[in-house]
């Protein structure tokens, strides 16, 4: 199985990844300087820029200046998910997590106790806001664009969660 028992793959340091991340960070900084983008995507009392599909990558995952790193494209070619959509730029600011507009008390407590987590693709439906797998993701490629301290959680993946999602 491509993701093994863990459900994720950790890639080693690669200079192409650094170049791609540097380019993405520059583009991200331009996006974050745009008041219209902030108005659309800033959530949780100004502590989370959600930024779904805001990075201007092409359908192959690259930018005009730099292609998607080979180590990623070779791996992703095994899954055959092309064309790729625009990348999300998720930025956490000091004070996160704060309640998101419309969050119930239990939803906010979940975020507070679970590494500020949500499960991509699991969306609340109806008045009860029961969660269903509405937007299944073939893969999530998480690339940090800045240095974080050792206790930070730029991306959290629960070991074996891919098996749970397959059952749903």
Describe the residue ranges of each PLM region.
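Fe(II)/2-oxoglutarate
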Residues: 1-13, 19, 23
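Non-heme Fe(II) oxygenase catalytic core, chiefly the N-lobe of the double-stranded beta-helix
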Residues: 3, 21-168
């Amino acid at each position: 199985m491509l993701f093994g028992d863990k459900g994720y793959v950790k890639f080693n340091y690669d200079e192409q990844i650094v170049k791609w991340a540097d380019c993405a960070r520059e583009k991200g900084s331009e996006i974050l300087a745009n008041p219209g983008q902030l108005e659309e995507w800033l959530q949780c009392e100004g502590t989370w820029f959600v930024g779904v599909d805001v990075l201007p990558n092409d359908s192959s995952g690259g930018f005009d200046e730099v292609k998607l790193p080979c180590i990623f494209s070779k791996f992703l070619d095994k899954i055959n998910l092309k064309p790729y959509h625009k990348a999300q730029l998720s930025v956490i600011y000091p004070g996160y997590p704060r309640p998101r507009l419309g969050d119930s008390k239990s939803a906010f407590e979940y975020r507070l106790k679970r590494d500020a987590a949500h499960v991509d693709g699991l969306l609340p439906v109806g008045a009860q806001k029961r969660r269903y797998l509405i937007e299944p993701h073939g893969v999530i490629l998480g690339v940090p664009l800045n240095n974080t301290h050792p206790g930070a959680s730029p991306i959290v993946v629960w070991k074996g969660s891919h098996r749970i999602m397959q059952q749903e």
